Amino acid sequence: MRKLFTSESVTEGHPDKICDQISDAVLDAILDKDPNGRVACETAVTTGMVMVMGEISTKCYVDIPKLVRETIRGIGYDRAKYGFDCETCSVITSIDEQSVDIAMGVDEALESKKGEMDKLDAVGAGDQGMMFGFATNETKEYMPMPIEMAHKLSRRLSEVRKNGTLPYLRPDGKTQVTVEYENGKPVRIDAIVISTQHGPEVYLEQIEKDIKEHVIKVIVPSELLDENTKYFINPTGRFVVGGPQGDSGLTGRKIIVDTYGGYGRHGGGAFSGKDPTKVDRSAAYAARWVAKNLVAAGVADKLEIQLAYAIGVAKPVSISVDTFGTGKMTDEEIVSIVNKVFDLRPGAIIRDLDLRRPIYKQVAAYGHFGRTDIDVPWERLDKVEEIKKHI
């Protein structure tokens, strides 16, 4: 049976991604000085303006306007002709402390209040909700091919802009990849869409030629392309006005880009700007860690795990898995292995993945999962042998 599946990615200069990176830059700066700081930082950008808001409880001081300007400069919006300039944009901040009602549940979980003395029971989940983790062996990154390929194309767009290969490119851009599957296995790429911001001096014909030569051919294996592969490069014909001048941006608006490109389910919670007591982030990372190690251990070819939490309670209220018919054992047996090998209380996740560190801005663009260009703890295959002992 043949079917098509499509996923998209965006570059670091996309307005929503600018916001994610600013929010995580603030988080990293606080965790660098105060590992126990509580952060829920949201950012909005529009023409000539950045607003940073949220709830932060910390003992340290960070210069938020300076962080904002440094982040925007690093992305590449450093001159007025790009429509957004790190030096001249206004920066507005509105920061409150974390609610004492939320802090009460996070600082002392329900289990601790009942007298259960395990130290890790003292950290309650920062909110209710469900989080999903996913892994598949269809790529070496254990990610679905459509999102993995889209991210690589987006990163390459940024690379050729910054290294001068295509100096007329500007920071905003999007990619989209359609993969054809046969009996559940990726066999070819059916379509590639790339929209990239550019200077007014260059014509579409040149952009099409350069993107095919310096981006697509460099990233996409030739055996996945054929005479029927369709290419759509700047299909509107012109993309000069972009970034915050073209569209407003908000933190947390690219949650599918951040995860599995729609191939796996999503619990709805965004990642950026949240410290690891927020299970939206830490439990989603843990779920990816669990799923990837299970697939690498041979438990299934494709696996999705759902974790659910109650605010102020340490232990997950439910754990479930789905192997989409590829499992080598029953779902109940897999959940049993998960409970034996992994401790999924928030305090244990923070400990085992060492999450109270400034490691978040680096994943705020080009995906939080499947990263091989950086070392993030939830991508490590450090539980495979232990899982195999229980198979």
Swiss-Prot record:
ATP binds at H14, D172, G173, K174, R238, F239, D247, R253, K254, A270, K274. GO terms for molecular function: ATP binding; magnesium ion binding; methionine adenosyltransferase activity. L-methionine binds at E55, Q98, D247, K278. It is found in: Cytoplasm. Coiled coil: none annotated. Its main location: cytoplasm. K(+) binds at E42. The keyword Metal-binding applies. It comes from the Bacteria. Mg(2+) binds at D16. InterPro entries: ADOMET_SYNTHASE_CS (IPR022631), S-AdoMet_synt_C (IPR022630), S-AdoMet_synt_central (IPR022629), S-AdoMet_synt_N (IPR022628), S-AdoMet_synthetase (IPR002133), S-AdoMet_synthetase_sfam (IPR022636). It holds the Pfam family S-AdoMet_synt_N. Keywords: ATP-binding, Cytoplasm, Magnesium, Metal-binding, Nucleotide-binding, One-carbon metabolism, Potassium, Transferase. Pathway: Amino-acid biosynthesis; S-adenosyl-L-methionine biosynthesis; S-adenosyl-L-methionine from L-methionine: step 1/1. PROSITE patterns: ADOMET_SYNTHASE_1, ADOMET_SYNTHASE_2. It catalyses: L-methionine + ATP + H2O = S-adenosyl-L-methionine + phosphate + diphosphate. Binds 2 divalent ions per subunit. Its cofactor is Mg(2+); K(+). GO terms for biological process: one-carbon metabolic process; S-adenosylmethionine biosynthetic process. Its EC number is 2.5.1.6. Catalyzes the formation of S-adenosylmethionine (AdoMet) from methionine and ATP. The overall synthetic reaction is composed of two sequential steps, AdoMet formation and the subsequent tripolyphosphate hydrolysis which occurs prior to release of AdoMet from the enzyme. This is S-adenosylmethionine synthase. It comes from Clostridium botulinum (strain Hall / ATCC 3502 / NCTC 13319 / Type A).
